């Protein structure tokens, strides 16, 4: 069935925010007495599930909202350093030109995402929802679908984390995983998205068949 509503995650899907996320990781790690000296350490953590990452830091689950708040503060100060993934702008503009509704549903702050989009002249999205619940992202996805009167078979979500895939599955919509973001490809594959792509070019070729 045609996909009229195409939803994107932001960090690790549209924007390469790993370098600024590393700065946030460093601050958080230092708070827990852990030295994080390289992005390789952060990438190693991304091979683990979120629960296992918290265990590695000895961080209780109830602390997650506080950590997210601190990370957001750091990202707000440094978002101008982030870059759009190569080929992503062309993909987004092509989808828009072909008549698709494109929107962002992200757990990041709306103000941070808007600052990035403005700096890259990406005023092409039909809507944006920020601060989507970390482990209940389907609530925000459902809200976006309702806004555009989109049915499940008309909607597809694209993200780089297992929680994106799990949220989409709980909602009953198709979901595409992308392996250039945060979660390791092995984790994404195990969560069984409808398709998993290694490059923006491969994703583009697929989306242009919809």
Q: Where are the regions that the model predicts?
A:
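Structural recognition of alpha->loop->beta junctions
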Residues: 120-128, 187-207
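Glycine-rich phosphate-binding loop signature in dinucleotide/nucleotide-binding domains
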Residues: 98-100, 148-154, 210
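N-terminal helical cap/lid subdomain that shapes the substrate entry/recognition surface
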Residues: 3-89
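A short, structured active-site edge motif that brings together acidic residues
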Residues: 41-42, 123-135
């Amino acid at each position: 069935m045609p996909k009229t509503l195409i939803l994107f995650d932001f960090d690790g899907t549209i924007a390469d925010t790993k370098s600024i996320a590393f700065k946030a990781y460093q601050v958080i790690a230092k708070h827990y007495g852990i030295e994080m000296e390289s992005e390789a350490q952060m990438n190693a953590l991304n091979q683990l599930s979120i629960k296992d990452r918290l265990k590695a830091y000895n961080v209780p689950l109830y602390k997650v909202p506080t950590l997210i708040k601190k990370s957001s503060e750091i990202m707000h100060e440094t978002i101008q350093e982030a870059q759009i993934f190569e080929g992503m702008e062309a993909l987004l503009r092509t989808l828009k030109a072909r008549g698709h509704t494109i929107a962002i549903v992200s757990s990041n702050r709306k103000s941070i995402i808007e600052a990035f989009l403005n700096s890259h002249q990406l005023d092409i999205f039909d809507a944006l929802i920020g601060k989507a619940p970390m482990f209940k992202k389907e609530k925000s996805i459902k809200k976006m679908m309702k806004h555009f009167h989109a049915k499940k078979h008309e909607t597809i979500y694209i993200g780089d984390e297992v929680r994106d895939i799990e949220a989409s599955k709980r909602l009953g919509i198709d979901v595409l995983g992308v392996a250039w973001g945060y979660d390791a490809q092995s984790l994404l594959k195990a969560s069984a998205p409808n398709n998993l792509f290694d490059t923006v070019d491969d994703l583009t070729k697929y989306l242009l068949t919809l």
